[in-house]
A protein has these predicted regions:
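Short, well-ordered beta-strand elements
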Residues: 33-46, 84, 94-97, 116-119, ...
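Aromatic- and charge-enriched surface segment that lines or borders ligand/interaction sites
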Residues: 85-132
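Bacterial N-terminal signal peptides that target proteins for export
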Residues: 2-11
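C-terminal motif of bacterial Sec signal peptides marking the signal peptidase cleavage site
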Residues: 22-24
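Surface-exposed binding/hinge segments that line
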Residues: 132-187
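Bacterial signal peptide processing site
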Residues: 26-28
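Extracytoplasmic/secreted proteins, especially bacterial periplasmic and envelope-associated proteins
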Residues: 61-64, 77, 81, 111, ...
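N-terminal lobe/hinge region of extracytoplasmic solute-binding protein
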Residues: 41-90
């Protein structure tokens, strides 16, 4: 009789455990649609401003929450992110990028070519004092703008349409796509 009580108790525990497991795995109809991601960093995030960032933690967080024209794949090769297509002129000095139309800011507004123009002009503007403005060297007029000799609006970047961006270079940059994956070039 003791054996039957033990089997009954074991069966009861198994049924309760199975029920609890199935209840935990099931999704109720009233479940919230809101998804939350908790993220930890090894250090305080100094800024999420691409023009102002200088530390690895800030750059890592931007890479995890934003996109530029390109991103680096597992082999550190540039692959399209917000860019869907890139065309380079025969002389290698003009690049034209078509942007994804589904790119959105956190408030739901579309990411457009004008956002890139604004961000890049802001980064090279001496008033912004970006420590990474030098990395724009090679883009038309960037060096003169950083030196305070030309207006930021003369930077070789232009919105040709809502989702079409043109970049003019002073000289060929064989590594240009790789540069565009760096957060300083994010919108």
């Amino acid at each position: 009789m003791e054996l039957n009580k033990g089997k009954s108790l074991l069966a009861g525990v198994a049924v309760l455990f199975s029920g609890a497991l199935l209840t935990a795995c099931g999704q109720s109809k009233g479940a919230s649609e809101k998804l939350v991601l908790n993220w930890m960093t090894s250090a305080e995030i100094i800024t999420m401003d691409p023009s102002k960032a200088t530390d690895a933690t800030s750059f890592t967080q931007m890479e995890n929450t934003m996109e530029g024209l390109y991103q680096l794949d597992k082999d550190n090769q540039a692959k399209e992110a917000l860019a869907t297509k890139a065309a380079q002129s025969k002389d290698g000095l003009t690049w034209t990028f078509d942007l994804r139309k589904d790119g959105k800011w956190s408030n739901g507004q579309a990411v457009t070519a004008k956002d890139f123009v604004y961000s890049w002009q802001r980064t090279v503007n001496p008033k912004t004092a970006s420590q990474y403005s030098y990395i724009f060297s090679g883009i038309k007029n960037a060096d003169a703008i950083v030196a305070g000799k030309k207006a930021p609006s003369s930077l070789g970047v232009k919105a040709l349409g809502k989702y079409k961006l043109q970049v003019k270079l002073d000289h060929k940059l064989p590594y240009f796509k790789l540069l565009l994956a760096f957060p300083v070039f994010f919108p």
